[in-house]
Amino acid sequence: MASCVGSRTLSKDDVNYRMHFRMINEQQVEDITIDFFYRPHTITLLSFTIISLMYFAFTRDDSVPEDNIWRGILSVIFFFLIISVLAFPNGPFTRPHPALWRMVFGLSVLYFLFLVFLLFLNFEQVKSLMYWLDPNLRYATREADIMEYAVNCHVITWERIVSHFDIFAFGHFWGWAMKALLIRSYGLCWTISITWELTELFFMHLLPNFAECWWDQVILDILLCNGGGIWLGMVVCRFLEMRTYHWASFKDIHTTTGKIKRAVLQFTPASWTYVRWFDPKSSFQRVAGIYLFMIIWQLTELNTFFLKHIFVFQASHPLSWGRILFIGCITAPTVRQYYAYLTDTQCKRVGTQCWVFGVIGFLEAIVCIKFGQDLFSKTQILYVMLWLLCVAFTTFLCLYGMVWYAEHYGHREKTYSECEDGTYSPEISWHHGKGSKGSEDSPPKHSSNHESHSSRRRNRHSKSKVTNGVGKK
């Protein structure tokens, strides 16, 4: 009797909710080819952990205090990553292996805890920590103190334009190519690119290196570097969307060359999802969600410049580019999870990686404000309000343009995940949300046995276009 009272049969909504959230937070591997790499090894890891800790505890020389602290920190990070592999969720991706994305999530949690720790230090303690990491930072200077910006903008020569194509210009180009691969929307990418240039104008009174000549900002940044990167990233997206994804097992490949090729392809997406951030039937909640996405994206970019300005290190320092690479790694699953939450009517909560990324963005901003009070005391509130209004206006224009384009040129057949109801059924659920952003949805099966040959061929070319629940959310 007690068991009957304590148990509860899951409703259809509960099944839908758990299934859709699991697909973005705990994606399962559908095409296991070598069982050894996906079988649990908890006892092996436990034995390795105990033996290695015993070895380091009783054999290493502990006479150097600084060396003890440094190696202790590295050991804590290493074993925390082991716990991450054992306990943390896969996230939306499983290529090349779920353990990699568990460690990425573990590193993001460590970075979040580190930012919390920084909030309880004073500025001198933070600087001492930086000097301990790199003694050369004692002699670092701000770029704004040794360089001039937006000087002689009326002098436009070919030599001067070419001189601006440095390593940072190529960094902008490849950075925007990667952003396009993550966002997969010309409209949003161009809106973020233009909005960022407006952000530089509104925060120029705080960061002098935001000052640029008009031709540098419009031609070199927006059109060439950002625009070229967006174009390249979207070309790759379109190529991956048109591919047919069918993965053969290692056991079915009998040649050495074939096995090597399959091993290399393990580092490529298992499938590719067609992404549509906005459509004519979207509600105001979707508009507000995309606006929040734009604000957090701009905030994360701003943190990059405020951190190196307040704590004084160059853009070429590992603290700068290392953070950029790290943020890029955790952005990939974050965007995928946020897109699913925003567009899937059955997904009622954000993924854990998305949650941690949001906290990191705001914590970085809080750290900047806490330790840069002298800088932020010069803030013009009017500029900040105008910046928020400009972001809202450009976001509205972007979404209006996307709706207009969808109404006039964007007609296409709906996939299962774009049906009105979005409810769970044994046949539809296999299609409904397996799509992941550059990740792990398996090719969908055909829905009808009496379709024509041309329809089957069209479906084969759109196998990877299953999106995760674009509904009326």
Swiss-Prot record:
Catalytic activity: a 1,2-diacyl-sn-glycero-3-phosphoethanolamine + L-serine = a 1,2-diacyl-sn-glycero-3-phospho-L-serine + ethanolamine; a 1,2-diacyl-sn-glycero-3-phosphocholine + L-serine = a 1,2-diacyl-sn-glycero-3-phospho-L-serine + choline
GO biological process, one term: phosphatidylserine biosynthetic process
Summary of the function given for this chain in its UniProt record: Catalyzes a base-exchange reaction in which the polar head group of phosphatidylethanolamine (PE) or phosphatidylcholine (PC) is replaced by L-serine. Catalyzes mainly the conversion of phosphatidylcholine. Also converts, in vitro and to a lesser extent, phosphatidylethanolamine.
Reported phenotype of the disruption mutant: Null mice are viable, fertile and have a normal life span. Toal serine exchange is reduced up to 85%, but apart from in liver, the phosphatatidylserine content was unaltered. Elimination of either Pss1 or Pss2, but not both, is compatible with mouse viability. Mice can tolerate as little as 10% serine-exchange activity and are viable with small amounts of phosphatidylserine and phosphatidylethanolamine content. to phosphatidylethanolamine.
Lumenal side of membrane: 57-72, 124-186, 238-286, 343-355, 405-473
Protein name in the entry: Phosphatidylserine synthase 1
Compositional bias (Basic residues): 455-464
Family statement: Belongs to the phosphatidyl serine synthase family.
UniProt topology in membrane: Multi-pass membrane protein
Superkingdom of the organism of origin: Eukaryota
Modified residues (Phosphoserine): S417, S425, S442, S454
InterPro entries linked: PSS
Tissue expression per record: Expressed in kidney, testis, lung, skeletal muscle, liver brain, heart and spleen with highest expression in testis, liver, heart and brain.
Region of interest called Disordered, as start-end residue ranges on this chain: 428-473
Signal peptide annotation: none
GO CC annotation terms, alphabetical: endoplasmic reticulum membrane; membrane
Main location: endoplasmic reticulum
Entry-linked Pfam families: PSS
Enzyme superclass (EC): transferase
UniProt gene name: Ptdss1
Entry keywords, A to Z: Acetylation, Endoplasmic reticulum, Lipid biosynthesis, Lipid metabolism, Membrane, Phospholipid biosynthesis, Phospholipid metabolism, Phosphoprotein, Transferase, Transmembrane, Transmembrane helix
Activity regulation details: Potently inhibited by choline in the mitochondria-associated membrane (MAM). Very little inhibition by choline in the endoplasmic reticulum (ER) per se.
Record topological domains on the Cytoplasmic side: 2-35, 94-102, 208-216, 308-319, 377-383
Record-level Gene Ontology MF annotations: L-serine-phosphatidylcholine phosphatidyltransferase activity; L-serine-phosphatidylethanolamine phosphatidyltransferase activity
Transmembrane segments: 36-56, 73-93, 103-123, 187-207, 217-237, 287-307, 320-342, 356-376, 384-404
Pathway linked to the protein: Phospholipid metabolism; phosphatidylserine biosynthesis
